[in-house]
Amino acid sequence: MASCVGSRTLSKDDVNYRMHFRMINEQQVEDITIDFFYRPHTITLLSFTIISLMYFAFTRDDSVPEDNIWRGILSVIFFFLIISVLAFPNGPFTRPHPALWRMVFGLSVLYFLFLVFLLFLNFEQVKSLMYWLDPNLRYATREADIMEYAVNCHVITWERIVSHFDIFAFGHFWGWAMKALLIRSYGLCWTISITWELTELFFMHLLPNFAECWWDQVILDILLCNGGGIWLGMVVCRFLEMRTYHWASFKDIHTTTGKIKRAVLQFTPASWTYVRWFDPKSSFQRVAGIYLFMIIWQLTELNTFFLKHIFVFQASHPLSWGRILFIGCITAPTVRQYYAYLTDTQCKRVGTQCWVFGVIGFLEAIVCIKFGQDLFSKTQILYVMLWLLCVAFTTFLCLYGMVWYAEHYGHREKTYSECEDGTYSPEISWHHGKGSKGSEDSPPKHSSNHESHSSRRRNRHSKSKVTNGVGKK
């Protein structure tokens, strides 16, 4: 009797909710080819952990205090990553292996805890920590103190334009190519690119290196570097969307060359999802969600410049580019999870990686404000309000343009995940949300046995276009 009272049969909504959230937070591997790499090894890891800790505890020389602290920190990070592999969720991706994305999530949690720790230090303690990491930072200077910006903008020569194509210009180009691969929307990418240039104008009174000549900002940044990167990233997206994804097992490949090729392809997406951030039937909640996405994206970019300005290190320092690479790694699953939450009517909560990324963005901003009070005391509130209004206006224009384009040129057949109801059924659920952003949805099966040959061929070319629940959310 007690068991009957304590148990509860899951409703259809509960099944839908758990299934859709699991697909973005705990994606399962559908095409296991070598069982050894996906079988649990908890006892092996436990034995390795105990033996290695015993070895380091009783054999290493502990006479150097600084060396003890440094190696202790590295050991804590290493074993925390082991716990991450054992306990943390896969996230939306499983290529090349779920353990990699568990460690990425573990590193993001460590970075979040580190930012919390920084909030309880004073500025001198933070600087001492930086000097301990790199003694050369004692002699670092701000770029704004040794360089001039937006000087002689009326002098436009070919030599001067070419001189601006440095390593940072190529960094902008490849950075925007990667952003396009993550966002997969010309409209949003161009809106973020233009909005960022407006952000530089509104925060120029705080960061002098935001000052640029008009031709540098419009031609070199927006059109060439950002625009070229967006174009390249979207070309790759379109190529991956048109591919047919069918993965053969290692056991079915009998040649050495074939096995090597399959091993290399393990580092490529298992499938590719067609992404549509906005459509004519979207509600105001979707508009507000995309606006929040734009604000957090701009905030994360701003943190990059405020951190190196307040704590004084160059853009070429590992603290700068290392953070950029790290943020890029955790952005990939974050965007995928946020897109699913925003567009899937059955997904009622954000993924854990998305949650941690949001906290990191705001914590970085809080750290900047806490330790840069002298800088932020010069803030013009009017500029900040105008910046928020400009972001809202450009976001509205972007979404209006996307709706207009969808109404006039964007007609296409709906996939299962774009049906009105979005409810769970044994046949539809296999299609409904397996799509992941550059990740792990398996090719969908055909829905009808009496379709024509041309329809089957069209479906084969759109196998990877299953999106995760674009509904009326």
Curated annotation (Swiss-Prot):
Residues 57-72, 124-186, 238-286, 343-355, 405-473 are lumenal. It is found in: Endoplasmic reticulum membrane. Its EC number is 2.7.8.29. The keyword Ribonucleoprotein does not apply. The modification N-acetylalanine is found at A2. Residues 428-473 are annotated as: Disordered. Residues 437-454 have a biased composition (Basic and acidic residues). The keyword Acetylation applies. Disruption phenotype: Null mice are viable, fertile and have a normal life span. Toal serine exchange is reduced up to 85%, but apart from in liver, the phosphatatidylserine content was unaltered. Elimination of either Pss1 or Pss2, but not both, is compatible with mouse viability. Mice can tolerate as little as 10% serine-exchange activity and are viable with small amounts of phosphatidylserine and phosphatidylethanolamine content. to phosphatidylethanolamine. Residues 2-35, 94-102, 208-216, 308-319, 377-383 are cytoplasmic. It is a multi-pass membrane protein. Keywords: Acetylation, Endoplasmic reticulum, Lipid biosynthesis, Lipid metabolism, Membrane, Phospholipid biosynthesis, Phospholipid metabolism, Phosphoprotein, Transferase, Transmembrane, Transmembrane helix. It comes from the Eukaryota. GO terms for cellular component: endoplasmic reticulum membrane; membrane. Potently inhibited by choline in the mitochondria-associated membrane (MAM). Very little inhibition by choline in the endoplasmic reticulum (ER) per se. Residues 455-464 have a biased composition (Basic residues). One of its GO terms (molecular function) is L-serine-phosphatidylethanolamine phosphatidyltransferase activity. It catalyses: a 1,2-diacyl-sn-glycero-3-phosphoethanolamine + L-serine = a 1,2-diacyl-sn-glycero-3-phospho-L-serine + ethanolamine; a 1,2-diacyl-sn-glycero-3-phosphocholine + L-serine = a 1,2-diacyl-sn-glycero-3-phospho-L-serine + choline. One of its GO terms (biological process) is phosphatidylserine biosynthetic process. The modification Phosphoserine is found at S417, S425, S442, S454. Pathway: Phospholipid metabolism; phosphatidylserine biosynthesis. Belongs to the phosphatidyl serine synthase family. This is Phosphatidylserine synthase 1. The gene is Ptdss1.
